[in-house]
Amino acid sequence: MSIVVQSAVTHFRPVMILAGGTGGHIFPGLAVAGVLRARGVPVVWLGAAGKMETHLVPKHGIEIQTIAVSGVRGHGMLALLGAPVRVLPAIFAAMRVLRRYRPRVVVSFGGFAAGPGGIAARLMGLPLIVHEQNRAPGMTNRVLARVARRVLSGFPGSFVAEEVVGNPVRKDIAALPAPGVRFAGRSGPVRLLVLGGSQGARVMNNALPVVLRVLSDSDVAVEVRHQCGEALRAETEGAYAYAGVAARVEPFISDMAAAYSWADLVVCRAGASTLAELCAAGVGSVLIPFPAAVDDHQRRNAEYLVAAGAALLLQQQDRAFYVYLESVLRDLLSNPMRRLAMAEAARGLAKSDAAECIAEIILKESI
């Protein structure tokens, strides 16, 4: 399948990006594609048929080719045993796409199509670059890293041999003033930003209203902005109303730079892109990793920020989760100096030029 936006006919061989399945793979690829295209380098995308990338990538003016492929993890032993039979046709399909476009270099950001696409690239002698966003690498990138020319990572510790370049973030977030400048002279309620992601996080929707109700007996006033996902909006609004806590509940926040700039503290999951944004913005956080994340990668991501003093980590499966959350928020909401120290520590981890750095490496490895 081909969704044509950018012409395949060009004087220059394109860079081919392999990414899909989730926004965590797709958005870093789009950021790097934007840098390459701004330099006049054509980009073509290889994705999986019927997945998120088939709708998202063309909206950014990039041509996408798709192959039929699906994941095998989490589908039982029979799926694993049958993986070679399912993957081989996808590899051959990827090779046909590669022969058509003759890319100068192939870059994997992970996802269903990245495995067959990366293997096909190496079989055809094309340079392969891998970028892993999480500290616990996905199965596809673990395999491809063994044969890749360059292995890049968003966090230290993903691979034994790696180049830590960071995860791409939006330019408006990276351009925010330093925490000390933003926080200077602030008065009034402490500003708490809660991010549940596009699908929402029910544990946050349930816990925050209850905990903030308990904290209302303190001397610290709190202003709450809670992003909960469209499907859970009514439920979240109801939880705050029942708890008697005023909050601005939103299904989606379009201007994340403004939201981070506004916030004194963030409560959120620990996806790689979110943590890269927290660091680029320079804001402290309470991280609640999604416990069902593959290879527990969100917890490992969070531990990197915790070790640097930029965040605190809570596990939602702990029996005393509500008690821990109340204790942590009571301390942080009443301690502006600690919030500032966490924000500055986060900013110290930022790699705001990640997209440009990755693009430079891609161009150096082009044939």
Swiss-Prot record:
It is a peripheral membrane protein. It is found in: Cell inner membrane. Coiled coil: none annotated. GO terms for biological process: carbohydrate metabolic process; cell division; cell wall organization; lipid glycosylation; peptidoglycan biosynthetic process; regulation of cell shape. It catalyses: di-trans,octa-cis-undecaprenyl diphospho-N-acetyl-alpha-D-muramoyl-L-alanyl-D-glutamyl-meso-2,6-diaminopimeloyl-D-alanyl-D-alanine + UDP-N-acetyl-alpha-D-glucosamine = di-trans,octa-cis-undecaprenyl diphospho-[N-acetyl-alpha-D-glucosaminyl-(1->4)]-N-acetyl-alpha-D-muramoyl-L-alanyl-D-glutamyl-meso-2,6-diaminopimeloyl-D-alanyl-D-alanine + UDP + H(+). InterPro entries: GlcNAc_MurG (IPR006009), Glyco_trans_28_C (IPR007235), GlycoTrans_28_N (IPR004276). Keywords: Cell cycle, Cell division, Cell inner membrane, Cell membrane, Cell shape, Cell wall biogenesis/degradation, Glycosyltransferase, Membrane, Peptidoglycan synthesis, Transferase. Its main location: membrane. Its EC number is 2.4.1.227. GO terms for molecular function: UDP-N-acetyl-D-glucosamine:N-acetylmuramoyl-L-alanyl-D-glutamyl-meso-2,6-diaminopimelyl-D-alanyl-D-alanine-diphosphoundecaprenol 4-beta-N-acetylglucosaminlytransferase activity; undecaprenyldiphospho-muramoylpentapeptide beta-N-acetylglucosaminyltransferase activity. Pathway: Cell wall biogenesis; peptidoglycan biosynthesis. UDP-N-acetyl-alpha-D-glucosamine binds at T22, G23, G24, N134, R170, S198, I253, Q298. GO terms for cellular component: plasma membrane. It holds the Pfam family Glyco_transf_28. HAMAP family: MurG (MF_00033). NCBIfam families: murG (TIGR01133). Cell wall formation. Catalyzes the transfer of a GlcNAc subunit on undecaprenyl-pyrophosphoryl-MurNAc-pentapeptide (lipid intermediate I) to form undecaprenyl-pyrophosphoryl-MurNAc-(pentapeptide)GlcNAc (lipid intermediate II). Belongs to the glycosyltransferase 28 family. MurG subfamily. This is UDP-N-acetylglucosamine--N-acetylmuramyl-(pentapeptide) pyrophosphoryl-undecaprenol N-acetylglucosamine transferase.
